[in-house]
Regions:
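A phosphate-binding glycine/aspartate-rich beta-alpha loop in the early core of alpha/beta enzymes
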Residues: 39-71
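Structural motif
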Residues: 3, 24-27, 42-45, 66-76, ...
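Conserved active-site and cofactor/substrate-binding residues in soluble primary-metabolism enzymes
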Residues: 4, 8-12, 21, 50-54, ...
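Glycine-rich, aromatic-bearing surface loops/beta-hairpins
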Residues: 80-143
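Short linear motifs at secondary-structure transitions and domain/linker junctions
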Residues: 1-5, 18-23, 50-54, 97-101, ...
Length: 143
């Protein structure tokens, strides 16, 4: 146990966050996300039983978002014609605003999101049941 580090962050995840450098990305995937096939040879960290919002909040206590890009946070946009509400996006926005005010969030078409996710340094698998709750974070620098 360590003080000041959310207990949700496993030693494996802390190691990955420390290994990542400026510009590296990671994806937090919901329960429907194809974690293993997207991860390929990248680290796949399982946080079953946890939701994407709580994982995002825990990670952002330690993880600086990139201020040198227009939008260091990417969400998978809803597929046209898919009549799905995305209230979790509001939760994400509040969490991001709490940790790094003024951060821009962009929405990425589904298959483009998958392509970007395949390039991520690591993939985090959650038990999130909300649809379209996938998020890519780009690491910044500690100032």
């Amino acid at each position: 146990m360590l003080k000041g580090i959310p207990s949700l962050l496993s030693p494996e995840l802390l190691k990955v966050l420390m290994e990542m450098g400026h510009g590296d990305t990671l994806v937090i995937g919901d329960g429907n996300f194809p974690h293993a096939s997207i991860a390929g040879d990248s680290p796949l960290i399982r946080l079953d039983g946890h939701g994407c919002a709580e994982v995002l909040d825990a990670i952002l206590t330690l993880f600086p978002l990139d201020t040198y890009v227009d939008a260091p946070v990417s969400l998978m946009e809803v597929v046209p014609g898919d009549n799905v509400e995305t209230p979790i996006w509001d939760e994400f926005a509040k969490i991001i605003e709490k940790h790094q005010p003024g951060t821009t969030i962009r929405h990425v078409e589904r298959f483009s999101f998958y392509d970007e996710a395949k390039k991520c340094y690591a993939v985090i698998s959650t038990g999130e049941t909300a649809l379209y709750a996938n998020v890519i974070l780009q690491k910044g620098v500690v100032k």
